[in-house]
Amino acid sequence: MLKNYLILGFTLLVVISCKEEPSNSEPNELNHELNPISSSFKKIQSSVSGIDFNNTITHDLNTKFNLFDYDFFYNGAGVGIEDINNDGLKDVFFTGNQVPNKLYLNKGGLKFEDITETANINTNKNWSNGITFADVNNDGWMDIYISQGGPVDENLRNNLLLINQKDNSFKEEANQYGLNDTGIS
């Protein structure tokens, strides 16, 4: 008998909770169209910030650079934010799959300088997946570890370790530190 009352009570609870509420066109906290939430974010054009990066992916059915041959083709890459020159400002590093990695030095006031070429960050670069900052050699300067992967030969997937040369440039030394792993990262 108690079981029947419990089933009846549960059924009534479900039926009551499923009734349709009339739509309310009055503005309120939940009606975003009538009362938009103000945003704390503001879009800054690349012409103002100096940051201009696009991880463009181009598939090619004649090679392994396509979704059919490489399941993770559209997984994307990575971004890292850290102070590479000890000036107290966070710099930005983008990894690119089929495009070069990019390093932007923070000049303050949301202005950045592209130091990719002079920083020597694309040595032995292939398909970069991600980035980690760490002071590997314990000298007080952030080094950069880049994981490599992609639909390339295993011998071309060595992860990269860029040791900070303390002058906004880096030297690739993954082999010297035993960190040139070839597994897909």
Regions found by a protein language model. Give the residues of each.
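Acidic, glycine/proline-rich Ca2+-coordinating loop motifs
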Residues: C18-S185
